Amino acid sequence: MMLIRVLANLLILQLSYAQKSSELVIGGDECNINEHRFLVALYDVWSGDFLCGGTLINKEYVLTAAHCETRNMYIYLGMHNKMYQFDDEQRRYPKKKYFFRCSNNFTRWDKDIMLIRLNRPVRNSEHIAPLSLPSSPPSVGSVCRVMGWGTITSPNETLPDVPRCANINLLNYTVCRGVFPRLPARSRTLCAGVLQGGIDTCKRDSGGPLICNGKLQGVVFWGPKPCAQPRKPALYTKVFDHLDWIQSIIAGNTTVTCPP
């Protein structure tokens, strides 16, 4: 009888622990160390606070969200665990920040993108390498990858030491319009998520990548609060629709022509 009681108590404890553990994650798992060499972290210089994610697209440029802008920031590359430093981690500062100023046929939903030129080139290493830009737009129905050091609880904020990765589905833009009627009829954004809920990007994942077929297709932009609600996907700035702007700046064109 005593043995049965002990085993029953152990089972209760185990089930309780499993339930609490599952409540600590907005979907996803710790990223594999080798799968996010392009993922960068943006920090505030004065407070040291972690702000946002971003993506290294070549040795001199990082792509992130415009709303991540702060006057004094630095960019950390090659990081996995905030508590343990790799030998090849590197820190850079913005040399110049570029924002999408175009107004013709563009709404505020189309402009949450920022290109940062670093103060000096990054050295590729075991934990640092750029992610390729797309040559074509992503297809609805694609399974895409998101990642970041954003909060793992919502609405209360709990920041992890390691980045979390998850797979989400690329949805038709009309799905997001059906949920959020204030969205414009046409937009240079992507709609993505898991309609069953439980998996989502969240606060401080902003600026991080949406990766489809190994290419940077989106930048984490906006989502409903709390995060990971059923039938409430999130919005991602569509990188392909801003490709000419990005490539013109990298090529040194200071008078970038806005797309039609």
UniProtKB/Swiss-Prot annotation:
Entry keyword annotation includes Cell wall biogenesis/degradation: no
Keyword match Transcription regulation: no
Protein name as it appears in the record: Thrombin-like enzyme 2
The species this protein was found in: Trimeresurus albolabris (White-lipped pit viper)
GO biological process: proteolysis
Tissue: Expressed by the venom gland.
GO cellular component: extracellular region; secretory granule
E.C. designation(s): 3.4.21.-
Similarity annotation: Belongs to the peptidase S1 family. Snake venom subfamily.
InterPro entries, alphabetized: Peptidase_S1_PA, Peptidase_S1_PA_chymotrypsin, Peptidase_S1A, Trypsin_dom, TRYPSIN_HIS
Signal peptide (residue range): 1-18
Glycosylation-annotated residues: N105, N156, N172, N253
Annotated compartments: Secreted
Annotated disulfide bonds: C31-C165, C52-C68, C102-C258, C144-C212, C176-C191, C202-C227
Domain of life: Eukaryota
Stretches assigned to the Peptidase S1 domain: 25-251
